[in-house]
Amino acid sequence: MERFLKQFWWKIIGIGLLMFAIVSGLWIPLYYGVAGLSFPNLPILNESIRNLLFHVPMWFSMVFLLLLSFIYSISYLGTPDRMRDNYAVGFAQVGVLFGALGIFTGMVWAKSTWGAFWTNDPKLNGAAIGMLIYFAYLILRSSVEDEMKRGKLAASYNIFAFIMYIAFIFVIPRLTDSLHPGNGGNPAFSSYDLDNTLRMFFYPATLGWIALSMWISSIWIRYNFLTQEYEEYED
């Protein structure tokens, strides 16, 4: 992972895909446009459908980062070392950042389509509870001074946190009625709200946001590692 994060090619490709998706996606009209390209002009959604290029890819990026954090926590319990712990917490911290951005863009979208920034919806409530679980993970890490004890305790909690988060945002909402697409019988990514033109920009946007989240994570992980090295050098 460390060798991959230091490589530059995937960062250029990711930023290129992201710029293509966002700039072009914001330019494509909701009616017959240049070269026949247009986004679905649906009732209620209207122009807010462009938020699909932000809200959903941010959540995909969050889940991807939290999955990596989960994997590194398992790896740390098997072979404890500082770098594995740094990867676990670094991916989790940036994952929480993208989760917060996902919630913010979702609230803006909800206000436009549902008439309120927040509703008593199992998907939304599950996302909020999941974020609180990860905030508790970060607080737990800062409350333990011994490095080895902190690493093992945090890794164990992180494994629990990821499993619970997946249950809160993917499993439980599917078992109940929900306004959110993809839950409670409300389909997501159907031909009704995701046509071929929108797919041309949605998939590159998803890959671009994931690449950006990985790039930010690599910088943050490196910063944390250098900070630890500097503090030990001063001591």
Locate each region found by the language model.
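Polytopic transmembrane helical bundles with strong interfacial aromatic enrichment
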Residues: 1-235
